[in-house]
Design a protein with these regions (language model features):
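Structured beta-strand/loop patches that form or line metal/cofactor-binding pockets in enzymes
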Residues: 1-47, 51-53, 332-338
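Conserved, mostly hydrophobic/aromatic
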Residues: 3, 36, 43, 106, ...
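Metal- or metallocofactor-binding catalytic centers and their adjacent structured scaffolds
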Residues: 5, 39-117
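Hydrophobic faces of well-ordered beta-strands that scaffold small-molecule active sites
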Residues: 48, 132-140, 163-165, 196-200, ...
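Shared catalytic-loop signature of beta/alpha-barrel
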Residues: 94, 228-243, 251-351
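Glycine-rich, aromatic-flanked loop segments that form ligand/cofactor-binding clefts
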Residues: 98-101, 105-147, 302
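Metal-dependent enolase-superfamily TIM-barrel catalytic cores that perform enediolate-based chemistry
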Residues: 127, 132-240
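Extended hydrophobic packing segments that form well-structured cores
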Residues: 357-377
Length: 377
């Protein structure tokens, strides 16, 4: 079996007209991603999802995908190690996240092909087992303490046992007392047993983080990458007692090795598309387990297609915080996956409609696959 063609299909998904989803770097009100389809000479097809970075940079990312895509044409999709080496030759030496996201889209399609060809779900290829679903977290948008507390109460009532709280400056403004009030309101609404992960999305300075985090300790939180860069993350880690999670700084095995060597964080937040796909993600979590570094599963801005692959991966590795990201698809009006395929939400738990379906078990709706953009082949 050989890879013969790669195509991309852009799609736009609008967010539901509820309270705006605000994070420290702006407002997210739509998803402008692309489906990536990889075809083989045996007729087996696999799908991945491309999230552009920056989020409004889809057209340029699709063009960049052509450089990576041509490296795998004519190759056996089962030779995943060789295919990643070929794709890596097309990447910059510093491995920026936007390039790893391109590789992650193709990687997901390759694993989908392998599963479909073998007649096995992807989680079995990875050595995992499906145990009736994966607990998910839900992200609470930046807002007033009252708004965020109300949002938290609603999500806990739905069955979510982990809440990720968006913090950080928005539109250039930051008030540390308000940040503390937000966490206090969320803990009060969530109760004592819900896990709270505070995520400023690198929206604080080192000084702000060291100033505000001691005041949040009483609320029993985890703190996810409050500052930009590994040097600053290490400074914060040495100054606080709350468990610190590396996110933006934990993009690949090379950086993870540095995090471990420098003791720059207690845990990492792993997003399979951002790491370059399942192949690299598995290596990263094997490293975490070998060096006793905690980890949690999370998502980028992705549809139900990529979230389905995330569930396959999450059944393979038991995270330190028993939750997974991937609920962004619940915020969109439209959907790109066929009904009764892939992942769905049952309260705060993500489940697969058919856990025995080969590959990812999810196929994009036919109407989204009518106008392909040729990538390679």
């Amino acid at each position: 079996m050989k890879i013969t063609m790669i195509e991309a299909f852009p799609f736009d998904l609008r967010y539901k007209p509820t309270r705006d989803f605000l994070v420290s770097y702006g407002v997210i009100d739509e998803m402008r991603n692309a489906i990536v389809r990889v075809t083989t000479d045996d007729g087996v097809v696999g799908y991945g999802e491309l999230m552009p970075l920056p989020l409004d940079n889809r057209d340029a990312c699709i063009e960049d995908l052509k450089n990576i895509g041509k490296a795998v044409i004519g190759q056996d999709p089962y030779e995943i190690r060789e295919l990643h080496a070929r794709m890596d030759e097309q990447l910059s030496a510093e491995l920026p996240s936007q390039e790893l996201l391109l590789k992650g889209a193709i990687d997901s399609a390759l694993y989908d092909i392998m599963g479909r060809a073998a007649g096995l779900p992807v989680y079995k290829l990875l050595g995992g087992s499906y145990n009736d679903g994966v607990p998910m977290h839900f992200s609470i948008s930046i807002g007033s303490p009252e708004e965020m507390g109300a949002d938290t109460a609603a999500r806990v009532a739905e069955g979510f046992r982990t809440i990720e709280v968006k913090l950080g400056r928005f539109q250039g403004e930051l008030d540390l007392d308000t940040e503390i009030a937000r966490i206090a309101a969320i803990r009060e609404s969530a109760g004592p047993d819900v896990v709270i992960v505070a995520d400023p999305n690198i929206g604080w300075t080192v000084e702000e983080a060291i100033d505000v985090l001691p005041a949040m300790e009483e609320f029993g939180i985890y703190i996810e990458q409050p500052v930009k860069g590994l040097d600053d993350l290490e400074k914060v880690h040495r100054a606080i007692r709350s468990p610190l999670i590396a996110d933006e700084s934990a993009a690949n095995t090379r950086v993870l090795a540095e995090i471990i060597q420098r003791d720059a964080a207690d845990m990492i937040n792993l997003k399979i598309l951002r790491t370059g796909g399942l192949y690299e993600a598995c290596k990263m979590l094997d490293m975490c387990e070998a060096f006793d570094i905690g980890y949690r599963h999370d998502n980028v801005i992705q549809s139900r297609l990529a979230s389905t692959m995330m569930i396959h991966f999450s059944t393979t590795y038991q995270a330190s915080i028993p939750d997974c990201g991937g609920t962004q698809f619940t915020r969109t009006i439209e959907d790109i996956v066929n009904d009764d395929e892939g992942v769905y939400m049952d309260g705060g738990t993500a489940k697969l409609y058919d856990p025995d379906a080969p590959g990812m078990g999810a196929t994009p709706k036919p109407e989204l696959l009518r106008d392909p953009i040729p990538i390679a082949g």
